[in-house]
């Protein structure tokens, strides 16, 4: 049985809350973003605070987008997922000394 695009029968055996990611829809969305932003004078960055699931991050990084991070942990997750350090921006306020060192040690693009 399906409800919209969701195969409900696959989910009936799960007894715990979970997230369902439609990877095909993500792929189509990322394709469209890349297509619409190529040859533009700006660069797309994904905000890790929205969702730091490593599988999703790897997929997004594979499109050549940058990462917008607001913590040292997000900087590390971005690098681990394959975002080039040259496209990692560390934004936000209240960075600890340790977080600043993480950014510097990984040679990220900039601090905001």
Model-predicted regions and their roles:
Residues 1-111:
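A charged N-terminal "starter" segment
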């Amino acid at each position: 049985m399906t409800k919209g695009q969701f195969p409900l029968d696959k989910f009936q055996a799960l007894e715990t809350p979970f997230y369902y990611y439609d990877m095909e829809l993500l792929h189509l969305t990322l394709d469209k973003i890349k297509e619409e932003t190529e040859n533009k004078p700006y660069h797309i960055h994904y905000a890790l605070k929205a969702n730091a699931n490593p599988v999703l991050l790897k997929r997004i990084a594979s499109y050549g987008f940058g990462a917008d991070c607001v913590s040292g942990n997000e900087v590390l997750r971005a690098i681990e997922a394959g975002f080039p350090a040259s496209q990692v921006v560390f934004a936000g306020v209240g960075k600890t000394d340790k977080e600043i060192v993480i950014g510097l040690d990984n040679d990220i693009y900039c601090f905001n």
